[in-house]
UniProtKB/Swiss-Prot annotation:
Bifunctional serine/threonine kinase and phosphorylase involved in the regulation of the phosphoenolpyruvate synthase (PEPS) by catalyzing its phosphorylation/dephosphorylation. Its EC number is 2.7.11.33, 2.7.4.28. Pfam families: Kinase-PPPase. Belongs to the pyruvate, phosphate/water dikinase regulatory protein family. PSRP subfamily. It catalyses: [pyruvate, water dikinase] + ADP = [pyruvate, water dikinase]-phosphate + AMP + H(+); [pyruvate, water dikinase]-phosphate + phosphate + H(+) = [pyruvate, water dikinase] + diphosphate. InterPro entries: Kinase-pyrophosphorylase, PSRP. This is Putative phosphoenolpyruvate synthase regulatory protein. GO terms for molecular function: ADP binding; ATP binding; phosphotransferase activity, phosphate group as acceptor; protein serine/threonine kinase activity. ADP binds at A153, V154, S155, R156, A157, G158, K159, T160. The keyword Lipid metabolism does not apply. The lineage of its organism: Bacteria, Pseudomonadati, Pseudomonadota, Gammaproteobacteria, Lysobacterales. Keywords: Kinase, Nucleotide-binding, Serine/threonine-protein kinase, Transferase. It is an enzyme of class 2 (transferase).
Length: 273
């Protein structure tokens, strides 16, 4: 059996739902090379037939049955896609019938509900949170009064991506503060952070992994040297311990997991967008 499998994320909208669920499923299987392709805005029969032909062509090219992760809400489009002979994984079908029975009503299919601008107020909050994260990145803001969380870590430990994820997916006003040499000379929190102790969450990282990341940014620099990374990480961890700041290692932790831990630790109740 071939270890190369073509995978198509097919959607009548942005494809975010299909790709997110599909990626989560595929990561459960090792030993395979998944060649993925996104097919988005497949919202009529003509587009569905074209997609089906492309999937069929992949079957012939790779000589193996493709996998289709489908989030199209129109069942007719799903039927057309199935003509490709691919393994069809419909992300809604297993649950819609159960929910219709439980709620005693039929679904109202609408493209883009999962990630569209269905609720303007919610969408506006998300955009504001994103702008906040960008304006409060890397300690550039003078105050964290409006922040709901302030991530603290040495440079390149995952602060910015996590803040952006919290903003986009939860509407959280997330700021971050980079620990510099001046801060790391003491086991006490920097003066700027002390008024916001209850909002702080520390990120740490394996020095070897940090060195790899920094090497990509500034090759062969003092900034990327392993001894620099070891010194900074050790100093940051001493500070977090002394100040009793909750921490999490980002070395083998996804942004999704980091964000969930932050929300739980700080008691931030917010539905995912």
């Amino acid at each position: 059996m071939s270890t190369i499998r073509p995978v198509f994320y097919v959607s009548d909208g942005t494809g975010i739902t299909a790709e997110t669920i599909g990626h989560s499923l595929l990561t459960q299987f090792s030993g395979f090379t998944f060649v993925t392709e996104r097919m988005v805005f497949i919202d009529d029969a003509e587009k569905a037939r074209d997609a089906s032909q492309r999937i069929l062509a992949a079957s012939e090219r790779y000589r193996v049955r493709p996998i289709v992760v489908n989030s199209c809400v129109n069942p007719y489009l799903s039927v057309i896609l199935a003509e490709s002979g691919a393994l069809m994984l419909d992300v809604f079908a297993p649950f819609i019938g159960l929910l219709e029975h439980e709620l005693n009503t039929s679904r109202h299919s609408r493209v883009g509900r999962a990630h569209g601008m269905v609720d303007f107020e919610t969408y506006h909050r998300r955009i504001n949170a994103m702008n906040f994260a960008l304006a409060h990145d890397d300690g550039v803001a003078a105050s964290y009064d409006e922040a709901e969380v302030v991530l603290v870590a040495v440079s390149r430990a995952g602060k910015t991506p996590t803040c952006i994820y919290l903003a986009l997916h939860y509407g959280i006003r997330a700021a971050n503060y980079p620990l510099i040499d001046e801060d790391l000379n003491s086991d006490q929190l920097p003066l700027r952070l002390r008024p916001y102790r209850k909002k702080l969450f520390g990120l740490t990282i394996n020095p070897e992994r940090l060195q790899q990341i920094r090497q990509e940014r500034r090759p062969n620099s003092r900034y990327a040297a392993l001894d620099t990374c070891k010194r900074e990480v050790a100093a940051a961890e001493r500070m977090f311990s002394a100040e009793r700041i909750t921490t999490l290692s980002t070395t083998h932790t996804s942004i999704e997991e980091i964000s969930s831990k932050v929300l739980v630790t700080l008691g931030l109740q917010r539905e995912m967008f």
